[in-house]
Regions:
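Conserved alpha-helical substructure of the radical SAM core
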Residues: 42-78, 88-92
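Auxiliary Fe-S-binding modules of radical SAM enzymes
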Residues: 2-16, 27, 61, 68, ...
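Short, basic/glycine-rich phosphate-binding loops at helix/coil junctions
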Residues: 40-43, 72-75, 137-141, 172-173
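Canonical Radical SAM [4Fe-4S] cluster-binding loop centered on the CxxxCxxC motif
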Residues: 16-57
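Short, histidine-centered active-site or binding-site loop motifs used for metal coordination
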Residues: 27, 42-45, 79-80, 176-178, ...
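Conserved AdoMet/S-adenosylmethionine-binding subsite of the radical SAM
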Residues: 86-220
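Glycine-rich beta-strand-to-loop/alpha-helix junction loops that act as flexible
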Residues: 77-83, 111-112
Length: 256
C-alpha cells in the first residue's frame, strides 16, 4: 500500500460533523499500537510511538492555507494512518489549533488505547469532540481482534474513559466495530453494555466491516446490529451500515 504523504485531506462533507478538514498525523506510513484484523490499511507491526511525523509548524501552516481557500469548515478532524494520539507533540498541536480555529470545532478519531496516560487525557480534554473506539472489554478479545501492542494496558482503558466522560465539558462519542465470530458473542456484548452504561458517552456508533480488511475476517449482519442496539439500554445508539435496509435511530435530532 502506498501513502500520499499529504498532511491535509478534504474538506469533505460529513453527515454528522458538517464540512470536515482532515489532518493526517502519520501521512507517510502506518504507525499504530493496534493491528486490528478489520483495518482498511495493510497489516503492520504495532508500535508504541511514532518515529516519523510532520512538525506542528507544518501542520498549522497547512491548516491556515486551507482556511484561506475554504471559508466554510465546520470541523478540523485529527486522524492518522494509525493512531493519532501517538503523535508526540499532540498537546502542543491542539493548543496551536485552538488559537486559530475560531468557531471551527475540533474532532479526534482515536482507538482509545492511550486515554489512561495523563498527557493524552489532558490533551483530549481540549478537543471539542472526542471519538474513541471500544471494540472489546476482555483481554482475550483485545488480543485477538485489535492485536494490541504490549505497551497497551487494556485494563486501564475503560476506567479512564469513565473518568474522562465525567470530567470533559465537551462531546464524547464511542464507536464499536463488530466482527463475525470475534466480538459478537453474548459475553462480550454484555461486558460492552456494562462499560458503556458506566462511561455514559453522548452517542455510540455501532457498525461492521464495509471495506476490504487487512485480514480474512467477515462482517456481522444488519439484523445483528439491530439486536445489539436494542440490548444497549439508556444509550443513544447509531447504526452505521452500508446499504442499510432501513433507518434506525435512537438518538435525538440535536445529537452531533
Amino acid at each position: 500500500m502506498s501513502y500520499s504523504n499529504s498532511i491535509i485531506f478534504g474538506p469533505i462533507p460529513s453527515r454528522r460533523f458538517g464540512i470536515s478538514l482532515g489532518i493526517d498525523l502519520s501521512p507517510g506510513k502506518k504507525q499504530c499500537n493496534f493491528d486490528c484484523l478489520y483495518c482498511e490499511l495493510e497489516g503492520a507491526k504495532t508500535v508504541d510511538k511514532m518515529d516519523e511525523y510532520p512538525s506542528v509548524e507544518n501542520i498549522i501552516n497547512e491548516i491556515k492555507n486551507s482556511f484561506k481557500t475554504h471559508h466554510k469548515i465546520d470541523v478540523i478532524t485529527l486522524t492518522a494512518n494509525g493512531e493519532p494520539t501517538l503523535y508526540p507533540k499532540l498537546d502542543e498541536l491542539i493548543n496551536e489549533i485552538n488559537k486559530i480555529k475560531a468557531n471551527t470545532k475540533t474532532l479526534i478519531l482515536s482507538n482509545g488505547s492511550t486515554i489512561y496516560k495523563k498527557e493524552i487525557y489532558d490533551a483530549l480534554l481540549k478537543i471539542d469532540i472526542v471519538k474513541l473506539s471500544l471494540d472489546c472489554i476482555s483481554e482475550k478479545c483485545f488480543k485477538k481482534l485489535d492485536r494490541v501492542n504490549n505497551s497497551v494496558e487494556t485494563q486501564k482503558i475503560v476506567p479512564a474513559m469513565i473518568d474522562f466522560s465525567r470530567q470533559t465539558k465537551n462531546d464524547l462519542v464511542l464507536e464499536i466495530l463488530f466482527v463475525k465470530d470475534l466480538n459478537d458473542k453474548i459475553d462480550e456484548i454484555e461486558l460492552l453494555n456494562k462499560a458503556i452504561n458506566q462511561i455514559k458517552p453522548k452517542r455510540v456508533d455501532i457498525g461492521t466491516i464495509d471495506r476490504p480488511p487487512a485480514y480474512q475476517v467477515k462482517p456481522v449482519t444488519y439484523e445483528f446490529l439491530e439486536d445489539v442496539a436494542s440490548e444497549f439500554k439508556n444509550i443513544n445508539v447509531n447504526i452505521v451500515y452500508k446499504n442499510r435496509p432501513k433507518s434506525m435511530q435512537t438518538y435525538s435530532e440535536d445529537e452531533i
